[in-house]
Amino acid sequence: MISRKSVITFGMVAIPIGMYTTTTDNDIRFNQLHKEDNSRIRYKKTCAHCGKEVKTEDIVKGYEYDDDKYVVITDEEIEKIKTEKEKSIQILHFAQLNQISPVYYEKTYQAVPETGGEKAFELLRSALMAEQKIAIGKTVMGTKDTLMAIIPREDGILISTMFYADDIKAIQKQYTKPEVNEQEFNMAKLLINSMDTPFDPSKYKDEYQERLRSLIETKISGKEIVAAEPESAGKVIDLMEALKASVEKAQKDKETA
């Protein structure tokens, strides 16, 4: 589903694009019910002044500039103050592909060229891939000046909205780094390499959501809920022994895969 249309601009080049959401929410949602009769809980929007219920079409946006004093702002007024530049994604500069910490990325979209923009789109994608660069751009989304990363892929371009530096919290708690001896370090590297396989997202499922869905189906059918088998905690052993045992298990798992 298309989220919005925009134009990527850099220099004198303009590339019309559609931005599509890349994820879907599959989480199970629960409704709030009245304990006595299992009826749905409803909420009403009411006016704080007169107490009347207010319909959606009668609700406007307002900014509180003083205690209980508001100025009403319409969507049309918000749209009017956007410049032509702000309606497009203006590329500000380019950076190394692996330079930006993942903590700055917020929401990701797939960019697809609109009719007439295919060649310029492919030129940007292939040039970014060849140079291993990403583009940093800016546009207005909603009521916010939004920073964006334009990320090349073999199969297209992704656009991620980004947090600003002052949106990111400083690391809340540091830790004292203990000494690691060479034998432990080498064994840890061996474990990492023994578990190294290409990333295949189709292999991973939300197993807890699957069990939750099974619980719901069991309750609907009136069957008894069976508790999951407890996993053995295992004994606390020496770090080196744990690393060795983990390497052996990983190697066996690879052989039987």
UniProtKB/Swiss-Prot annotation:
Keyword terms, alphabetized: DNA damage, DNA recombination, DNA repair, DNA-binding
KW DNA damage (keyword) present: yes
GO biological process: DNA recombination; double-strand break repair via nonhomologous end joining
InterPro entries linked to this entry: Ku70/Ku80_beta-barrel_dom, Prok_Ku, SPOC-like_C_dom_sf
Residue span(s) of domain Ku: 9-184
GO MF entries: double-stranded DNA binding
Function: With LigD forms a non-homologous end joining (NHEJ) DNA repair enzyme, which repairs dsDNA breaks with reduced fidelity. Binds linear dsDNA with 5'- and 3'- overhangs but not closed circular dsDNA nor ssDNA. Recruits and stimulates the ligase activity of LigD.
Assembly with partners or alone: Homodimer. Interacts with LigD.
HAMAP family according to UniProt: Prokaryotic_Ku
Family, similarity comment: Belongs to the prokaryotic Ku family.
Protein name: Non-homologous end joining protein Ku
Organism for this UniProt entry: Lachnoclostridium phytofermentans (strain ATCC 700394 / DSM 18823 / ISDg) (Clostridium phytofermentans)
This protein's encoding gene: ku
